[in-house]
Amino acid sequence: MSTTKLDSIKDNALAAFKAAPSSKDLYDLKVQYLGKSGSLTEIMKEMASLPKEEKPLFGKKVNEVKQLLEAAYTEAEDALKKKEISAKMAAEEIDMTLPAFSQPKGTAHPVNIVVEEIFTVMSRLGYSIRTGPMIEKDYYNFEALNIPADHPARDMADTFFVDKTHVLRTHTSPIQIHSLENEELPLRVIGTGPVFRCDSDISHLPNFHQIEALCVDEKISMADLKGTISFFVREFFGPGLKTRFRPSYFPFTEPSAEVDCSCPICKGKGCSLCKQSGWIEIGGCGLVNPKVFQAAKIEYPKWQGFAFGFGVERMAIIKYGIEDIRLFPENDVRFLRQFVK
């Protein structure tokens, strides 16, 4: 009777293991047949009622069935795990036919776009890019540029002083002095970076960006300066634009001039951007003052040079017809999206 019951347990367990739909169901069957209170454990208790001579044979058969069921369980467990992994992978498979999610395009800031375009134009003329410290010594920001402590030109810019001898640079002109002191002549450099002044309104920011170009060679004249700027204006704003030079004053250049170009928006006909004049001021320029060469220990008149500087935000305003300079630092995506390259 016990042998017949043992065979029945074996057959039922093998069939159940094979038919188990999941790993959890299979484990429950293992507990049912092979657990401490399972069917095999219960049938072992019946050995006590068997004759003494039958007990060894019956015990051996129970162990054989147990080993068989354990092997069958392991085989069924492996098969179910593979099946479940395959099902999971199939469920997670990427359907390449599904429509893709559109990603918004990143945009370069208009200031960076303008700087890159200026560098592209000037590099064609042999100019190399330079930068300088934003916290500058008073000497480089003023004195080396022919602006001593008692010079009235210091009133032209309200300055952020870090301490008695250091300032947040008010212009990028100090890059000229660093280049003259540290580089071999002749040289053509263009510097850029943020500058700082105590000023803020519709056309001024306390923190804005400048471009500063310097050319030094043995024979430099005002004609070279005018030709370079005229070429730059046409390449940057577009062909057909005119330039004009008005006498002005800067301590670090002599002679000095303000540079105007015909309005690229209205082509000189008159509009709100150029205030109906047809002309827009874009920056200042001049031949390098001999005192600047003297401060940098450069022999003059053997070496001569010219320099010019533009406000980057102003160049962007003129090129793109932007009405308020205060839009640049706000980082409003509605504004920035208009400049996707």
Curated annotation (Swiss-Prot):
Biological processes annotated in GO: phenylalanyl-tRNA aminoacylation
Please report the name of this protein according to its UniProt entry. Phenylalanine--tRNA ligase alpha subunit
The GO cellular component terms are:
cytoplasm
Similarity annotation: Belongs to the class-II aminoacyl-tRNA synthetase family. Phe-tRNA synthetase alpha subunit type 1 subfamily.
Q: How does it assemble?
A: Tetramer of two alpha and two beta subunits.
Cofactors required: Mg(2+)
Q: What is its EC number?
A: 6.1.1.20
Q: Name one Pfam family in it.
A: tRNA-synt_2d
Catalytic activity reads: tRNA(Phe) + L-phenylalanine + ATP = L-phenylalanyl-tRNA(Phe) + AMP + diphosphate + H(+)
Q: Which UniProt keywords apply?
A: Aminoacyl-tRNA synthetase, ATP-binding, Cytoplasm, Ligase, Magnesium, Metal-binding, Nucleotide-binding, Protein biosynthesis
Tell me which residues bind Mg(2+). Answer: 254
The subcellular location is:
Cytoplasm
User: Which GO terms of the molecular function aspect are on file?
Assistant: ATP binding; magnesium ion binding; phenylalanine-tRNA ligase activity; tRNA binding
Cofactor details (free text)? Binds 2 magnesium ions per tetramer.
**Record organism:** Bdellovibrio bacteriovorus (strain ATCC 15356 / DSM 50701 / NCIMB 9529 / HD100)
